[in-house]
Curated annotation (Swiss-Prot):
Physiological role: Catalyzes the methylthiolation of N6-(dimethylallyl)adenosine (i(6)A), leading to the formation of 2-methylthio-N6-(dimethylallyl)adenosine (ms(2)i(6)A) at position 37 in tRNAs that read codons beginning with uridine.
This protein's encoding gene: miaB
Binding site for [4Fe-4S] cluster 1: C24, C60, C97
Disulphide bonds in the chain: none
Entry EC number(s): 2.8.4.3
Protein name: tRNA-2-methylthio-N(6)-dimethylallyladenosine synthase
């Protein structure tokens, strides 16, 4: 009998993973890094859940009904699994902040789930998956002793190239501020800062894969601190000066910041570094000192306004975005008017605004004098009308200007490309320029939350 020729055996098809990501930019980063770590087990990313062998739901716990949204997704996945044939099994995992908060309750309510992994454990995902293949149900929500970032594999260059020329890089995680409305200290843990060496190496990997713009991430990113090779303590401003020297990198950003940690070295970086884009997301949440105190924000509105002025003096072309919560317990009409007053003074380019919703486990959830939903709705509508007016005014203010735009991807129409302005907003332009190039574009009009540009005569 002839022996089979191994060369004629078709290679095994790669396993596919689909990750549904909710929430912040850090969750996007986490999903990308989970995909990279799973490549060691033969997984490749897919954009459609129907052909996936593994589906992960990477969750966010910031807003109300986050858990309910998860269980709705899991209900649909239960039907999908039932429809699978025996030769196409489906594994289901839940990751992220709802996983951290709910833990084993997820397995109780949704037996379809094979594993539950908190944000500090996703570096163990490949090994935990192997355990589920033995029929085990896994709940891994403890805070790992080891540095999870040190155990992640290098970036997959092919995957990075597919994602585009802009990338996220987590430099700090967790929060020690304990704002009374926020679950982050409970789901992400205490503040940790990655080392300068780790950050530099990951930035180099991204640049080698074609990335031109890096956004440094952290729940409290300007709380980052580390040591340089000489043992000197660095803050975020020092790190930005350091990364700005990397060959091939064209742009830097960072988010999200706390007003308390905006120090002089960071403001100086905005003044000195052209590579640092003139855009800053600086949440304030309320303009009322009484509400800021109740939120444990640890600053007053005047301090925030003075900080805005100081940063604008350092970088006159900077655009600010913010976060606002209306209807925090005890908020009066007068408190809300203080918020409106602050918004008018700052003049934001964009902002995120929400109705307060009590998050289990936070101090805010135990407070009295909750605001009626109808009042919250009215205040939110009022606030959003003002913010939209400011956003449109900012867009119009750039008409007629020429600005450098990073070309990111093809547009909807033939010959059209979409780029990123220095102020983060997209720019649509007819051009043959390649992705990754930075070119001067004349802003001739605006669209919904974006600019319409044209090539200049260089």
């Amino acid at each position: 009998m002839n022996k089979a020729n191994p060369k004629n055996i078709p290679p095994l098809a790669p396993k596919k993973v689909f990750i549904k990501t909710y929430g912040c930019q850090m969750n996007v980063y986490d999903s990308q890094r989970m995909t990279d770590s799973l490549s060691s087990k033969g997984y490749v990313a897919t954009q459609t859940p129907n052909d996936a062998d593994l589906i992960l739901v990477n969750t966010c716990h910031i807003r109300e009904k986050a858990a309910e949204k998860l269980y709705s997704d899991l209900g649909r996945l239960r039907v999908m699994r039932q429809e699978r044939t025996p030769d196409k099994p489906l594994m289901v995992g839940v990751t992220g902040c709802v996983a951290q908060a709910e833990g084993s309750e997820i397995l109780r309510r949704a037996p379809i789930v094979d594993l539950v992994i908190g944000p500090q454990m996703y570096h163990r995902l490949p090994d935990l998956l192997e355990q589920t293949k033995q029929g085990k149900k896994i709940v891994a929500t403890e805070y790992a002793v080891e540095d999870k970032f040190a155990h992640l594999p290098p970036h997959n260059k092919r995957a990075v190239r597919k994602r585009g020329v802009s990338a996220f890089l987590t430099v700090q995680e967790g929060c020690d501020k304990f704002c009374t409305f926020c679950v982050v200290p409970y789901t992400r843990g205490a503040e940790i800062s990655r080392s300068v060496e780790q950050i530099t190496e990951e930035a180099r990997q991204l640049i080698e894969a074609g990335v031109k713009e890096i956004t440094l991430l952290g729940q409290n990113v300007n709380g980052w601190h580390g040591q340089n090779v000489n043992g000197k303590t660095w803050r975020l401003g020092d790190l930005l000066y350091h990364l700005a020297k990397l060959d091939g990198l064209k742009r830097l950003r960072y988010t999200t910041s706390h007003p308390r940690d905006m120090d002089d070295s960071l403001i100086a970086a905005h003044r000195d570094l052209d590579i640092l884009m003139p855009y800053l997301h600086l949440p304030v949440q309320s303009g009322s000192d009484r509400i800021l105190k109740a939120m444990n924000r640890q600053h007053k509105s005047i301090h925030y306004l003075q900080l805005i002025e100081k940063i604008r003096n350092a970088r006159p072309d900077i655009a600010f975005s913010g976060d606002f919560i209306v209807g925090f317990p005890g908020e009066t009409d007068e408190d809300f008017e203080e918020t409106i007053k602050l918004i008018k003074q700052v003049e934001y380019s964009s902002a995120y605004s929400f109705k307060y919703s009590p998050r289990p486990g936070t101090v805010g959830a135990t407070m009295k004098n909750h605001v009626e939903e109808a009042v919250k709705d009215a205040r939110l509508q009022h606030l959003q009308v003002l913010l939209l007016e400011q956003q449109n005014a900012f867009l119009r203010s750039k008409i007629g200007q020429t600005t450098d735009v990073l070309i990111e991807k093809a547009g909807r129409h033939s010959g059209q490309m979409v780029g990123r302005s220095p102020w983060l907003l997209p720019v649509v332009v007819d051009t043959q320029a390649s992705t990754g190039t930075v070119i001067p574009i004349h802003i001739k009009n605006t669209s919904s939350n974006s600019f319409v540009g044209e090539m200049t005569n260089m």
